[in-house]
Regions:
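A residue-level marker of the well-folded mature domains of exported/periplasmic proteins
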Residues: 1-272
C-alpha cells in the first residue's frame, strides 16, 4: 500500500503514465496469484487487499488461480496476465518464484509493477520488483512440539499461533519499498499484537454493499477428495463475527474465512 501511495503521489503512476492501471471509476488495480479458491487462500488475499486498501482506499483487486500449490509456469503466466490487465502490485499465495520472476521481467521492460511474495524472501529473484514476502516462522512450532514431547505431553492436533508469538511476519524489505515503510510496518505489527488492530475489522469491508454483522461457520472437517464431499468430523456451527471483526483461526487453526468482499474479483477460469 505504501509503495502504491508513493508512486501515485509522486506522479510515477497516473492515468496518463499507465492508463490500464485504473478502472472506469478511477480505482487503481492490484492483482493476486492464488493456488486454489480454498478458505486459506481467500483469507490471505482478503487480508492482503485490506492492507493495501487501508493506505490507498481507491483500490480494486483481481485474483487468478493456478489450481496448483507449486507451478512456476502457471504462476508466472498468472502474474503476466494480471499485469497486462493493469495490476501494479502482485501478491501471491502459491509456493514458487514464478510470479515474482515474471513481475521483475516486466518491471525491467518498463512496466510499473511490483511483487509481494509468499513463504520466502524473493529479493534474489526480483531484486528491484520485490517489496517483501509474507512468511511463517516454523521455529516457534518446532520449539513448542519438541518441548511438549520432551515433557511427556501429547501434541495438539489443532494448533495455531500468530504475531503475538512471532510465528508469522514478513521478510526483509526490498530496495524499492517506499520511504518510511519499516517504521510503518513496526507500528502495524505492534497494533496487531496488542489487539488494537484487527485484520478483518468489519467496518473496513462490505459484502454486496452491506456491512457483515453475522458469519456462521461450520467447523466440520470435510473430505474433498470424494464427490460429493463427505463429513469426516461433524463440528459445531459458531458465529465468526466477534466484537466487530471476523475472528479468523480462533475456533480452529485451519482458516475458515470464505467471504467474497466488495472490491475483489476472481477469474472464473484457472490459468492454463
Amino acid at each position: 500500500g505504501l509503495k502504491l501511495k508513493e508512486i501515485m503521489e509522486d506522479g510515477t503512476l497516473t492515468a496518463e503514465t499507465q492508463p490500464d492501471s485504473f478502472d472506469a471509476d478511477g480505482n487503481v488495480k492490484i492483482g493476486y496469484v492464488g493456488a486454489f479458491s480454498y478458505a486459506e487462500v481467500v483469507s490471505g488475499y482478503t487480508a492482503f487487499y485490506l492492507g493495501v486498501k487501508s493506505v490507498v482506499p481507491n483500490v480494486v483487486m483481481e485474483v487468478k488461480y493456478t489450481n496448483s500449490w507449486f507451478d512456476i509456469d502457471k504462476e508466472g503466466a498468472a502474474a503476466e496476465a494480471l499485469i497486462a490487465n493493469g495490476s501494479v502490485i502482485i501478491g501471491q499465495h502459491a509456493d514458487s518464484t514464478g510470479a515474482p520472476a515474471a513481475t521483475q521481467k516486466l518491471h525491467d521492460d518498463g512496466k510499473i509493477c511490483y511483487s509481494v511474495g509468499y513463504n520466502i524472501d524473493m529479493i534474489a529473484t526480483a531484486p528491484t520488483a520485490a517489496l517483501t514476502s509474507a512468511t511463517n516462522n516454523w521455529a516457534v512450532y518446532y520449539k513448542h512440539a519438541i518441548a511438549t514431547v520432551m515433557g511427556g505431553g501429547d501434541l495438539e492436533q489443532d494448533w495455531s499461533a500468530g504475531y503475538n508469538d512471532d510465528a508469522v511476519g514478513i521478510t526483509e524489505l526490498g530496495e524499492s519499498c517506499a520511504e518510511g515503510t519499516a517504521d510503518y510496518v513496526a507500528d502495524i505489527e505492534s497494533k496487531l499484537k496488542d489487539g488494537s488492530l484487527q485484520v478483518f475489522d468489519t467496518s473496513t469491508f462490505t459484502v454486496g454493499g452491506e456491512e457483515v454483522t453475522s458469519a456462521p461457520v461450520d467447523l466440520s472437517f470435510m473430505d474433498y477428495t470424494t464427490d460429493p464431499a463427505t463429513v469426516v468430523y461433524q463440528g459445531e456451527t459458531v458465529e465468526a463475527i466477534q466484537d466487530g471483526h471476523f475472528a479468523e483461526s480462533t475456533f480452529r487453526s485451519a482458516p475458515y474465512f470464505t467471504l467474497r468482499i466488495d472490491g475483489i474479483t476472481e477469474d472464473a477460469e484457472a490459468v492454463e
